[in-house]
């Protein structure tokens, strides 16, 4: 199987598991979507500052990660406190997901995330992607159906 096929299968299982009709992103899920992907190669001392994406759902597949000398070094962090902006609801705790080769992590594209700094002298290689609806009429995931 190609990485795209594995990713689409994983996304399908993710949707089946989480589509309980309560979440707008799943209620308005497009019949067809594109995967817009890129690879990221980082060396010792690397980090990626907090950011969001323009897709509906984003993901990262970890190819190679350095052996960790520090607990969270090189891991991915999700938080609503990424910038100096007011937080209306503070019921989403900071969450750190450990990276390991072969792990695929999916998350809403609008959720701020970053790569925590690492200093190990090894490469960190990942493949990131956004899921973008293929449609002439795009309904934002937060809009009512």
Can you say where each PLM-predicted feature lies in the sequence?
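Catalytic core of non-heme Fe(II) oxygenases with the double-stranded beta-helix
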Residues: 2-8, 12-106, 110-126, 130-141
